[in-house]
Each structure stands twice: as structure tokens, then as C-alpha cells.
Amino acid sequence: MMAYHSNSRWSGALVSGALGVCAIVAIIRPAHADPRAVVELFTSQGCSSCPPADKILGELAKDPSVIALSMPIDYWDYLGWKDTLADARFSARQKAYSHMRGDRDVYTPQVIVNGSVRLIGSDRAGIEGAIGDTKKTDGVMSVPVSMTLAGKQISVSVAASSTASTEAHGEVWICSISKTVPISIGRGENSGRQVTYYNVVRNLLKIGDWNGSSGNWTIPLESISREGVDAAVVYVQDGNRDKPGAMLGAAYTSLH
């Protein structure tokens, strides 16, 4: 499937500063310590080619060295089934990647590995090959990221990069995640099927800018909480939301 679509607004939020809360500080132990890859899957409940890719993403999510994210898009909603997990921001993100590459390859299922390598989402061998080709000496996934929980706040720490240039610029984002979401699809190409989606991004908030130096940010837990959210991901990405580049670091953790 292939589609071209209009830009969408992103609802980023910058939240920082001490809130004066007295609480026991507990380190959130990342389930994915020192990950080597962030794998984004652009998928749709209305795409008959997507279920195999959704299954592969679920299998990749079990790998502690991989942060796998499902980003359901909305541009197939006109085909007869409105995707119940879709977000126009994910459609805009996929299109932004295509603009950065200089092509118009916007389709489902599509995987982006570490912000730079695009593949068909059902090409498991290709995805695993791209993950294996990651070289931290090039700066990709080389920045340590950690999260701590203090009462009703999440604190994010990003270490300084040893490879970033003096002109480095990127952004720090936090994602709300639902680990598994089974969906019964009533119409469209997947009518009558039940498909389970893994590590579904339910919200996406910008929390800061990055220039290669270490940084710390504090986010109210309620800003990413909603029904069904049971994990969080923080990632540092070169460029910005309209011109996304390489993934520089990330962390994933369960919230419950």
C-alpha cells in the first residue's frame, strides 16, 4: 500500500523544573539496558499486509537490545475501517522521514531502524541485518539515557556524547506505551481478524533539546499516563520532528 498525505500538527510539550515534591526516589530499571536499536513500525489496522509485520515487531520487542515501537498511521482510514490506535502525528513522522531521504516512500508496513534505514515491515532478515550493522562509533545509539521515578514525576537524564560535533542538535522525546493491544477488526481489508499490536505509542511529547552535552528533565507522570499505558520510552534523536535524523540514544521501562 502507498499513500501521500498532508502535514499534521504535533502536540509536543516541554516540561522541566523541580516541583518541590518530597518522595522516595526509585531508579526505574530499564528493561532494555544499553539498547543498540530503535525500530519504528508504521502500521495500520486497515492494511492487509501489516499483520505479519505486527507479529515480527512483537518478537523484536522481546529482545532486550532492541526498543520496538508501533506507530499506527491514519491515512488508510478512508478504506472502510477507522484505525482505533492511529495518530496523525505518526503519519506526519513517517512523511518527515521520507522528506529527509529525498523520496516519497510512504507505505505500510514500513520499518525505520535507528532513524535512518527504511525497510518493508515484514522483512525480518533485513531488519535484523540493519540492527546488526549499527555502529556506536558513528554516534548512532551511543548516548546513555536513563529514567528515575520520584513520586508522581519521571526524571530523565541524558549523558554527554563523546562523538557529537560542536554543531550537534537534536531533541529528547518521551513516549507513552501500551505493551500489548488486541484489536478485533470489523471492516476493511482485515475484516473479521483479531490482531495484537505491540509496544503501541499512545502519546509522544517533546521534553527538551540536545546539543551534545548532558541534560536533565522532569516530567509529571500524569502527562504520559492514560488508560492502558504500562511502559515508557525516552529517545534522543538528531535533527528535529520535521527533519528527523539518526537515533542517538534511548531507554525503555515498564511503569507497573
Regions found by a protein language model. Give the residues of each.
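Extracellular/secretory pathway and lumenal proteins
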Residues: W10, L14, A26, P51-D54
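Short, conserved sequence motifs used for protein processing/export or organelle targeting and
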Residues: K82-R104, S116-H256
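Bacterial N-terminal signal peptides that target proteins for export
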Residues: M2-A18
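Active-site-proximal cofactor/substrate-binding loop regions of enzyme domains
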Residues: A31-Y107
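The N-terminal extracellular segments of secreted preproproteins, especially immediately downstream
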Residues: V21, G46-S49, I174
